[in-house]
Amino acid sequence: PAVQGNDKKYTMSSVLKVSAADWKTNRFYQCQAGYNLNDMVESRFETPKIQEPNITALVPSVDFISSQNAVLGCVISGFAPDNIRVSWKKDQVDQTGVVLSSKRRTDNTFETISYLIIPTVNWKIGDKYTCEVSHPPSNFRSMISMKYQEGEKSSCPSGSPPGTCPPCSLTPELLYHTNLSVTLRNGEKHQYKCD
């Protein structure tokens, strides 16, 4: 039933319940409202798309590896809806990282960054760090491992065939002097702000 507000205008709501199977099958739902059939207002709803994320590792550039702490990161992009989980491990031991709030991109997918601050000495002696990412809506689960090697930076997705992820060709850089400004090797730049 319609409800009259303080401004003497009436408000009415309607709810459509659909099964999960129908929700996944149909891309659009429409709602029409009005006083008569010739003067209806229509609203159209698009079901949210489900898209799994891309993960890119961020490791210290050689210019910034001499400081007391190093920052490792994961850029997680292109996922929808906004429901992402990230965890960090050092040689299978849980670590406490930071996950920033997701940003909506122009294509209605989302991106975020997670980072872990570690002692530079641990990075230089070759400890292995792993960023684990899961996206429940798409059943996506993956990890990317990072390990320092003298003279090069290596970072390959877990399970990559040998020779498909050569060091220095795919690894982006995290530039510490701008904190959360990320420049990838292809020149693409991302700016992240802490909330």
From Swiss-Prot:
Primary location class: secreted
Gene3D superfamilies (alphabetical): Immunoglobulins
Cited PROSITE patterns: IG_LIKE (PS50835), IG_MHC (PS00290)
Any one GO cellular component localisation term in the record: extracellular region
Subcellular location: Secreted
Domain Ig-like C1-type span(s) in chain numbering: 53-145
Protein name: Splenic IgW, short secretory form
Native organism: Ginglymostoma cirratum
